[in-house]
């Protein structure tokens, strides 16, 4: 489709004329709508969520419940490889007794090594916190969708601080389940945490290595670590010092356990001040804007391209004008409704939209703040209706639904 050849501008209202081809309630508080553009080939699949319905809630999921989760595909990103697809996570969690009605792909990710480009919080658990250097260079991934325990929502930027307290002394750690614990890259940080999510053999023939030239402090809480929930008391169960000798890196399997990998002066100090059986305190704070309220769900996005009702274009013109399939999430000004919508593209039946065009769609949908998740061949939406779960959009990946890294589910409590 050529706007110019058709003497048509994406500034025109008529450019966004559509017809509603499907409109039905999937569950109480969840409405599905399918919009089909009239003047060119474009379909949009939207889910409207009533935020005043306390039975409708959000859940997030990491593929296979592990992180990192390598795909072993050299980032070719074609279809299903090793990691769970969205459909598989929705089906699995329904089988576990969770009434999942809708699912979408969320974060951008490195497919081969299997880590997201932004943070992932599930039921308060810091599943993935990337290191400060990566956070500082991925400036277009600083936003996200945060659903707090009190059911409020934020799209603001985030800031993480992790601390281990030994007596009155505090020691900062910088990441959770980040591949930085391989100790193979620069820059490095002298204390990084990993948990039961960091699995030694995530898939047959693939490993998640951990560098051994470090001090390993293994602790166990009486409950799983959560962000914005204060200090958790932990007991040191084991200390392994691999700085001067060959050791095997420890992996843990209990949800209450964690491993702090420490190097440098911090390791020198901790090895003197800690012994097995000692009590310590550990905390994880994730500030969203100015809020440190307890968090149920956080999924990192790419751009927040509608902010307080105003179009906020990506700074690079070529990014702003690139036409893509996309996955988006936005909220109305009165905060009564969230709309999740997928823009299809890269096929004969769907052109895709650029950021300005997506903004015009948001405006038409009545949205005041909007973020964009991963797009392209990752864009996918799944729904459950009349006993059947299925993908409802047209995935543009030539090999079908893709093994993404993490997903967002909409659940109705029963």
Where are the model-predicted features located?
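Well-ordered beta-sheet/strand-loop patches within structured domains
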Residues: 235, 243, 252-256, 287, ...
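Loop/turn positions that initiate beta-strands
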Residues: 274-281
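Conserved, well-ordered active-site substructure
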Residues: 113-139, 147, 296-368, 373, ...
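Zymogen propeptides
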Residues: 1-261
């Amino acid at each position: 489709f050529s706007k110019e050849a058709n003497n048509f501008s994406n500034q025109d209202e008529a450019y966004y004329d559509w017809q509603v081809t499907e409109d039905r309630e999937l569950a109480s508080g969840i409405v599905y709508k399918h919009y089909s553009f009239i003047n060119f080939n474009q379909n949009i699949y939207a889910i409207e969520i009533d935020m005043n319905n306390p039975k409708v809630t959000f859940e997030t999921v990491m593929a296979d419940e592990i992180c990192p989760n390598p795909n072993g595909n050299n980032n070719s990103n074609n279809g299903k490889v090793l990691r769970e697809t969205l459909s598989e996570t929705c089906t699995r969690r329904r089988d576990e007794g969770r009434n999942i009605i809708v699912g979408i792909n969320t974060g951008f990710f490195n497919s081969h090594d299997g880590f997201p480009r932004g943070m992932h919080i599930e039921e308060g658990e810091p599943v993935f916190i990337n290191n400060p250097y990566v956070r500082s260079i991925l400036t277009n991934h600083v936003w996200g969708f945060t659903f707090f325990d009190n059911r409020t929502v934020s799209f603001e930027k985030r800031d993480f601080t992790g601390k281990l307290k030994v007596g009155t002394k505090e020691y900062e750690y910088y990441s959770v389940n980040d591949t930085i614990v391989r100790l193979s890259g620069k820059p490095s940080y002298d204390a990084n945490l990993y948990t039961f999510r960091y699995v030694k053999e995530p898939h047959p023939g693939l490993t998640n290595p951990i560098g051994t030239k470090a001090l390993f402090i293994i602790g166990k809480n009486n409950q799983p670590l959560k962000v914005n929930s204060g200090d958790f008391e932990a007991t040191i169960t084991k200390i392994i010092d691999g700085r001067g000798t060959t050791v095997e890196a420890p992996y843990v399997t209990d949800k209450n356990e964690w491993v702090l990998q420490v190097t440098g002066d911090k390791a020198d100090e901790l090895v003197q001040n800690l012994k097995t059986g000692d009590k310590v305190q550990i905390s994880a704070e994730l500030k969203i804007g100015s809020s440190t309220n307890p968090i149920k769900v956080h999924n990192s996005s790419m751009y927040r391209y509608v902010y307080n009702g105003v179009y906020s274009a990506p700074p690079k013109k070529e990014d702003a004008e690139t036409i893509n399939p996309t996955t988006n999430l936005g909220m109305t000004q009165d905060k009564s409704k969230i709309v999740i919508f997928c823009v299809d593209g890269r096929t004969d039946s769907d052109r895709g939209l650029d950021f300005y065009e997506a903004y015009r769609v948001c405006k038409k949908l009545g949205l005041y703040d909007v973020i964009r998740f991963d797009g392209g061949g990752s864009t996918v939406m799944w729904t459950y209706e009349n006993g059947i779960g299925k993908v409802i959009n047209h995935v543009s990946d030539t090999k079908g639904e893709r093994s993404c890294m993490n997903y967002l589910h909409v659940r109705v409590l029963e």
